[in-house]
Amino acid sequence: MRLNELSPPPGSRRARKRVGRGEGSGYGKTSGRGQKGAKARSGTKAYTTYEGGQMPLQRRLPRLKGEARGRHTPAHPKVYDPVNVGELAAVEGDTIGLDELRAAGLIRKKADTLVKILGDGEIDRPVTVRAHAFSRAAREKIEAAGGRAEVL
């Protein structure tokens, strides 16, 4: 067998459709474009948002103003798992970090979870809390109980 004897497997290659090459081919004369009209002409194409004459979607919807237009919002905003100060009382230990919160079922098990401690509820023992963010009220309640709020 030589390279010039190789050919692709039968059915793996489709022949190009040759249009405008005589009536007997089935694609002569109008080349599969029908009779007249915009789609029968060369060099014309309806723009992508054209909806056949009805009012297009981008014109039916109102224009958004200000920050809602998306200029000032980040593409991927940070999403925090919220944990209230009152829920920390159920977690054992002097130091409460992400592993302890996961074990208690207060946050998702994903490794890249961001945690924010919020100020709802009370805590009555001094604990060191490690999280990505704290609300002002949460930080004040933790420190008032004699604990520390450490930002990761």
Curated annotation (Swiss-Prot):
The keyword Iron does not apply. Keywords: Ribonucleoprotein, Ribosomal protein, RNA-binding, rRNA-binding. InterPro entries: Ribosomal_uL15, Ribosomal_uL15/eL18, Ribosomal_uL15/eL18_sf, Ribosomal_uL15_bac-type, Ribosomal_uL15_CS. Residues 22-35 have a biased composition (Gly residues). GO terms for biological process: translation. Residues 1-79 are annotated as: Disordered. GO terms for cellular component: cytosolic large ribosomal subunit. GO terms for molecular function: rRNA binding; structural constituent of ribosome. SUPFAM superfamilies: Ribosomal proteins L15p and L18e. Belongs to the universal ribosomal protein uL15 family. Part of the 50S ribosomal subunit. Binds to the 23S rRNA. This is Large ribosomal subunit protein uL15. The lineage of its organism: Bacteria, Bacillati, Actinomycetota, Rubrobacteria, Rubrobacterales. The gene is rplO.
